[in-house]
């Protein structure tokens, strides 16, 4: 099983798809990596030679921030926005949408589950 950036790639998938299991590598970046390393994109991970695996591993670590480093960078960027008190930082802290979306309705993903507020009870007649 090939390991790239601390992630075990699934053995039965094509290398092009398997690379997307690494945080920070999507399909277009995986295709770019394969083109630059000269590995056949139709190769399955189980059929990958040690030489090819080493080529992929070194190319990814030298050219991209992936996995833990990328997660740390993202969280530090958000922390910086919060610390300097920007509007975006306040929205992150409040758990609301950051990029100008409406919040009167929708925004459920960012705000979490609905909290039902009991309405006024009708007086019995």
UniProtKB/Swiss-Prot annotation:
InterPro entries (alphabetical): Rbsml_uS13_C, Ribosomal_uS13, Ribosomal_uS13-like_H2TH, Ribosomal_uS13_bac-type, Ribosomal_uS13_CS
GO molecular function: rRNA binding; structural constituent of ribosome; tRNA binding
Chain intervals with Basic residues compositional bias: 101-125
One Pfam family matching this protein: Ribosomal_S13
Positions of the UniProt region annotated as Disordered: 96-125
UniProt signal peptide: none
Annotated Gene Ontology cellular component terms: cytosol; small ribosomal subunit
Subunit structure: Part of the 30S ribosomal subunit. Forms a loose heterodimer with protein S19. Forms two bridges to the 50S subunit in the 70S ribosome.
Functional summary from the UniProt entry: Located at the top of the head of the 30S subunit, it contacts several helices of the 16S rRNA. In the 70S ribosome it contacts the 23S rRNA (bridge B1a) and protein L5 of the 50S subunit (bridge B1b), connecting the 2 subunits; these bridges are implicated in subunit movement. Contacts the tRNAs in the A and P-sites.
Similarity field: Belongs to the universal ribosomal protein uS13 family.
Protein name: Small ribosomal subunit protein uS13
Organism of origin: Picosynechococcus sp. (strain ATCC 27264 / PCC 7002 / PR-6)
């Amino acid at each position: 099983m090939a390991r790239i950036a601390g992630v075990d790639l699934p053995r039965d998938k094509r290398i092009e798809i398997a690379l997307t299991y690494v945080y920070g590598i999507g399909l277009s970046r995986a295709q770019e990596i394969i083109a630059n390393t000269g590995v056949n994109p139709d190769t399955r991970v189980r059929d990958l030679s040690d030489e090819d695996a080493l080529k992929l591993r070194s190319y990814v670590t030298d050219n991209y921030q992936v996995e833990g480093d990328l997660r740390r960078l993202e969280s530090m960027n958000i922390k910086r926005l919060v610390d300097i008190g920007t509007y975006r930082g306040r929205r992150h802290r409040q758990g609301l949408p950051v990029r100008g979306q409406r919040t009167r309705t929708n925004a459920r993903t960012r705000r979490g589950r609905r909290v039902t507020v009991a309405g006024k009870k009708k007086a019995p007649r």
